[in-house]
From Swiss-Prot:
One cellular component (GO) term of this entry: cytosolic large ribosomal subunit
GO molecular function, one term: structural constituent of ribosome
Biological function: This protein is one of the early assembly proteins of the 50S ribosomal subunit, although it is not seen to bind rRNA by itself. It is important during the early stages of 50S assembly.
Name of the protein: Large ribosomal subunit protein uL13
Native source organism of the sequence: Pyrococcus furiosus (strain ATCC 43587 / DSM 3638 / JCM 8422 / Vc1)
Length: 142
Protein backbone atom coordinates (compact mmCIF):
# COMPACT_ATOMS: atom_id res chain seq x y z
CA UNK A 1 0.00 0.00 0.00
CA UNK A 2 1.33 3.41 -0.96
CA UNK A 3 0.26 6.51 0.96
CA UNK A 4 0.70 9.66 -1.14
CA UNK A 5 0.53 13.18 0.25
CA UNK A 6 -1.17 15.35 -2.41
CA UNK A 7 -0.15 18.65 -0.79
CA UNK A 8 1.37 20.90 -3.46
CA UNK A 9 1.08 18.34 -6.26
CA UNK A 10 -0.37 19.16 -9.69
CA UNK A 11 -3.65 17.24 -10.03
CA UNK A 12 -3.25 15.95 -13.59
CA UNK A 13 0.31 14.74 -13.10
CA UNK A 14 -0.60 13.14 -9.78
CA UNK A 15 -3.60 11.43 -11.40
CA UNK A 16 -1.59 9.96 -14.27
CA UNK A 17 1.08 8.53 -11.94
CA UNK A 18 -1.53 7.09 -9.56
CA UNK A 19 -3.54 5.59 -12.45
CA UNK A 20 -0.40 3.78 -13.61
CA UNK A 21 0.22 2.45 -10.08
CA UNK A 22 -3.38 1.22 -9.82
CA UNK A 23 -3.21 -0.57 -13.16
CA UNK A 24 -0.03 -2.32 -11.99
CA UNK A 25 -2.03 -3.76 -9.07
CA UNK A 26 -0.94 -1.52 -6.19
CA UNK A 27 -3.29 -0.16 -3.54
CA UNK A 28 -3.00 3.62 -3.31
CA UNK A 29 -4.18 5.99 -0.58
CA UNK A 30 -4.13 9.74 -1.22
CA UNK A 31 -4.25 12.10 1.76
CA UNK A 32 -4.61 15.92 1.83
CA UNK A 33 -6.61 15.84 -1.41
CA UNK A 34 -7.88 19.39 -0.85
CA UNK A 35 -4.29 20.71 -1.08
CA UNK A 36 -3.61 19.38 -4.60
CA UNK A 37 -3.41 22.14 -7.21
CA UNK A 38 -4.91 22.73 -10.64
CA UNK A 39 -2.74 24.92 -12.85
CA UNK A 40 -4.04 27.74 -14.99
CA UNK A 41 -6.11 30.90 -14.79
CA UNK A 42 -8.35 30.96 -11.71
CA UNK A 43 -11.46 32.24 -13.51
CA UNK A 44 -11.16 29.72 -16.36
CA UNK A 45 -10.79 26.81 -13.91
CA UNK A 46 -13.81 27.90 -11.86
CA UNK A 47 -15.91 28.37 -15.01
CA UNK A 48 -14.94 24.90 -16.35
CA UNK A 49 -15.83 23.10 -13.12
CA UNK A 50 -19.07 25.07 -12.71
CA UNK A 51 -20.17 24.08 -16.24
CA UNK A 52 -19.41 20.43 -15.50
CA UNK A 53 -21.50 20.33 -12.34
CA UNK A 54 -24.47 21.92 -14.12
CA UNK A 55 -24.51 19.36 -16.98
CA UNK A 56 -27.77 17.39 -17.25
CA UNK A 57 -29.70 15.63 -19.98
CA UNK A 58 -32.78 17.32 -21.39
CA UNK A 59 -34.92 14.19 -21.25
CA UNK A 60 -34.31 13.24 -17.62
CA UNK A 61 -31.97 15.37 -15.49
CA UNK A 62 -31.72 12.62 -12.85
CA UNK A 63 -29.73 10.46 -15.29
CA UNK A 64 -26.54 12.50 -15.12
CA UNK A 65 -23.70 12.83 -15.88
CA UNK A 66 -22.82 13.68 -12.30
CA UNK A 67 -19.64 15.53 -11.40
CA UNK A 68 -18.46 15.84 -7.80
CA UNK A 69 -18.35 18.96 -5.66
CA UNK A 70 -16.21 17.65 -2.76
CA UNK A 71 -12.43 17.88 -3.09
CA UNK A 72 -11.73 14.18 -2.40
CA UNK A 73 -14.32 13.18 -5.01
CA UNK A 74 -12.89 15.66 -7.56
CA UNK A 75 -9.50 13.95 -7.20
CA UNK A 76 -11.08 10.46 -7.48
CA UNK A 77 -13.00 11.47 -10.62
CA UNK A 78 -9.85 12.90 -12.22
CA UNK A 79 -8.02 9.62 -11.62
CA UNK A 80 -11.02 7.66 -12.91
CA UNK A 81 -10.78 9.58 -16.18
CA UNK A 82 -7.27 8.18 -16.67
CA UNK A 83 -8.33 4.56 -16.15
CA UNK A 84 -10.06 2.27 -18.67
CA UNK A 85 -13.31 2.65 -16.70
CA UNK A 86 -15.51 0.64 -19.05
CA UNK A 87 -13.40 -2.50 -18.67
CA UNK A 88 -13.29 -4.90 -15.74
CA UNK A 89 -9.58 -4.19 -15.30
CA UNK A 90 -10.22 -0.45 -14.94
CA UNK A 91 -13.03 -0.89 -12.41
CA UNK A 92 -10.94 -3.24 -10.28
CA UNK A 93 -8.05 -0.77 -10.38
CA UNK A 94 -10.37 2.06 -9.30
CA UNK A 95 -11.53 0.03 -6.29
CA UNK A 96 -7.93 -0.07 -5.05
CA UNK A 97 -7.95 3.74 -4.66
CA UNK A 98 -8.83 5.62 -1.47
CA UNK A 99 -8.81 9.43 -1.27
CA UNK A 100 -9.10 11.46 1.94
CA UNK A 101 -9.41 15.11 2.91
CA UNK A 102 -6.72 15.73 5.51
CA UNK A 103 -4.88 12.85 7.15
CA UNK A 104 -7.06 10.23 8.89
CA UNK A 105 -5.94 8.86 12.28
CA UNK A 106 -5.08 5.47 10.81
CA UNK A 107 -2.41 7.06 8.57
CA UNK A 108 -0.93 9.55 11.04
CA UNK A 109 2.63 8.69 11.92
CA UNK A 110 3.08 6.56 8.79
CA UNK A 111 5.52 7.51 6.09
CA UNK A 112 3.90 9.64 3.37
CA UNK A 113 5.24 9.60 -0.18
CA UNK A 114 5.25 12.49 -2.61
CA UNK A 115 5.69 12.53 -6.38
CA UNK A 116 8.56 14.88 -7.19
CA UNK A 117 7.72 15.15 -10.92
CA UNK A 118 4.24 16.43 -10.03
CA UNK A 119 5.26 19.11 -7.51
CA UNK A 120 4.06 22.68 -8.09
CA UNK A 121 7.58 24.08 -7.51
CA UNK A 122 8.52 22.78 -10.98
CA UNK A 123 6.18 25.31 -12.64
CA UNK A 124 7.76 28.25 -14.43
CA UNK A 125 4.67 30.43 -13.80
CA UNK A 126 2.98 29.67 -10.50
CA UNK A 127 -0.65 30.26 -11.56
CA UNK A 128 -2.82 27.70 -9.82
CA UNK A 129 -5.87 27.04 -7.65
CA UNK A 130 -6.13 24.37 -4.96
CA UNK A 131 -8.77 21.65 -5.28
CA UNK A 132 -10.18 22.81 -1.93
CA UNK A 133 -10.84 26.29 -3.35
CA UNK A 134 -12.62 24.78 -6.37
CA UNK A 135 -14.74 22.59 -4.08
CA UNK A 136 -15.66 25.55 -1.90
CA UNK A 137 -16.65 27.53 -5.02
CA UNK A 138 -18.87 24.65 -6.19
CA UNK A 139 -20.58 24.45 -2.80
CA UNK A 140 -18.85 21.33 -1.51
CA UNK A 141 -18.21 20.72 2.18
CA UNK A 142 -14.43 20.37 1.99
Amino acid sequence: MRIINAEGLILGRLASKVAKMLLEGEEVVIVNAEKAVITGNRDVIFKKYKQRTELRTLTNPRRGPFYPKRSDEIVRRTIRGMLPWKTDRGRKAFKRLKVYVGIPKEFQGKELETIIEAHVSRLSRPKYVTVGEVAKFLGGKF
